[in-house]
């Protein structure tokens, strides 16, 4: 019908004209017509109009409530979506599987584990826990939220898991860094007579790359050929990535060269592979080839190339990348900024790094750590400690990395008083027994010739390793106590 063709903000005016004609005909309050109007306004991006129409519907049913919830979930306004969900239950309207599926998209986006758990409990209470599609959606939600325990629980309690549920479980393991477990599940799935799908192969290749298992990766590559998936772009990209992560760059390059429809992901995984193996020049060369093929870089491309520039110490390439980043409007993205600051520091351009840092509207702990680390590595201990003070004044909470870097700054300046102040801050955060933090504290006290304090700290460490002993010995040696 005419309303279904109004499906984007460009059609909002046309939709309002249709709405006026419906009001004139007196059908606006009809539940079916009203629900269609809600969906139309949602697709046109006008949640205010959708809400007004919904409030005028007589005897709203589960479909109209779900349409309203879906409207807010689609635009990431999950708080409002949950408010409608609560109102729906208060009015004794029972949600259906579609209601929950609409919600879960919002939980994916926000990675809202608590809200996802609430929805899961509600679906169980409403006897919807046997719906395979809904189970899979919940399993994927828990995977995205990093809750592997919930992923395993749903799978184990499913009577007859199909390939979709198996894929979700394998993906859950692979995405959360459990590559070995993911591959064990894949093998078990095969033993139970369930054929591998393209999604299974993708998850398996991700797992192989995570644990550098090129043998199982090659077996999956054979499966790709057997299933005729050699032209499937996501599969090809995953093969390039897997071989690169396993250090087989020649094979990765061969697979890449055979891809006829390469996209930005294809280039990114190969560039990343070379850079991770510290073949930075090859990574930059690939970036130039990518431009010649007319593929536009994205933030991942720049992250890889900035790392390559840092490895090379190439300010010329780095500044060229920076200019492109600005031209594409990516200069305010935190990960890009962190890498830019790191690149300029590693190239020895500390003033430029400071300028990039200062231009950001807000600085997170990672960015502060990058700056402080850069100062310490270049011997600017005083600037590192000043930055630490500014970081605290900005109410950014330091991490173990922050403390390790600032303690190194104190050691380089033999600034015992400042070291003791940092020690107090470490104790307040309960980090003094972490091996690296504790060992750096020992080193700071020993370097500043407070051997009594260094020895007392060494005794307090839960485990004394070669790192902590070396920290003390280095302090003694520095002050001529080599014996």
Task: Annotate each predicted stretch with a short phrase.
Residues 1, 6, 11, 75-102, ...:
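Hydrophobic or amphipathic alpha-helical targeting/insertion segments
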Residues 15, 30, 34-35, 50, ...:
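Pentatricopeptide repeat
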């Amino acid at each position: 019908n005419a309303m279904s063709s109004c499906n984007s903000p460009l059609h909002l005016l046309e939709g309002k004209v249709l709405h006026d004609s419906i009001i004139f005909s007196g059908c606006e309050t009809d539940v079916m017509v009203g629900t269609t109007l809600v969906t139309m306004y949602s697709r046109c991006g006008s949640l205010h109009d959708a809400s007004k129409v919904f409030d005028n519907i007589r005897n709203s049913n589960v479909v109209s409530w779900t349409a309203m919830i879906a409207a807010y979930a689609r635009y990431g306004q999950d708080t409002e979506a949950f408010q409608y969900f609560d109102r729906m239950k208060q009015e004794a309207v029972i949600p259906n599987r579609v209601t929950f599926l609409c919600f879960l998209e919002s939980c994916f986006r926000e990675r809202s584990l608590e809200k996802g758990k609430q929805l899961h409990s509600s679906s169980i209470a409403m006897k919807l826990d046997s719906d395979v599609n809904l189970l899979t959606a919940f399993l994927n939600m828990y995977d995205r939220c990093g809750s592997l325990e919930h992923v395993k629980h749903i799978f184990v309690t499913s009577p007859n898991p199909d390939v979709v549920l198996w894929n979700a479980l394998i993906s859950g393991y692979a995405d959360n860094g459990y590559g070995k477990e993911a591959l064990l599940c894949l093998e078990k799935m095969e033993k139970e007579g369930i054929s591998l799908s393209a999604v299974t192969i993708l998850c398996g290749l991700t797992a192989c790359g995570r644990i550098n298992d090129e043998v199982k990766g090659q077996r999956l590559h054979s499966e790709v050929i057997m299933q005729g998936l050699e032209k499937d772009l996501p599969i090809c990209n995953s093969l390039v990535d897997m071989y690169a992560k396993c250090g087989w760059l020649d094979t990765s390059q061969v697979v890449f060269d055979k891809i006829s429809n390469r996209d930005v992901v294809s280039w990114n995984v190969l560039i990343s592979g070379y850079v991770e193996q510290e073949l930075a020049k090859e990574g930059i060369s690939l970036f130039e080839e990518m431009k010649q093929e007319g593929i536009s870089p994205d933030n991942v491309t720049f992250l890889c190339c900035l790392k390559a520039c840092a490895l090379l110490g190439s300010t010329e390439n780095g500044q060229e990348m920076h200019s492109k980043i600005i031209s594409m409007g990516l200069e305010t993205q935190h990960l890009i900024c962190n890498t830019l600051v790191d690149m300029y520091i590693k190239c020895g351009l500390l003033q430029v790094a400071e300028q990039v840092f200062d231009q950001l509207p807000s600085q997170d702990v990672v960015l502060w750590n990058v700056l402080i680390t850069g100062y310490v590595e270049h011997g600017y201990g005083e600037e590192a400690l000043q930055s630490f003070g500014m970081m605290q004044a900005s109410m950014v909470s330091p991490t173990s990395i922050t403390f390790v870097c600032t303690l190194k700054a104190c050691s380089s300046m033999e600034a015992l008083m400042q070291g003791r102040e940092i020690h107090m801050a470490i104790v307040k955060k309960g980090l003094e027994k972490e091996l690296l933090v504790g060992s750096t504290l020992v080193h700071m006290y020993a370097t500043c010739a407070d051997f009594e304090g260094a020895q007392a700290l060494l005794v307090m460490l839960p485990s004394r390793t070669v790192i902590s002993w070396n920290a003390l010995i280095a302090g003694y040696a520095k002050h001529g106590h080599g014996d």
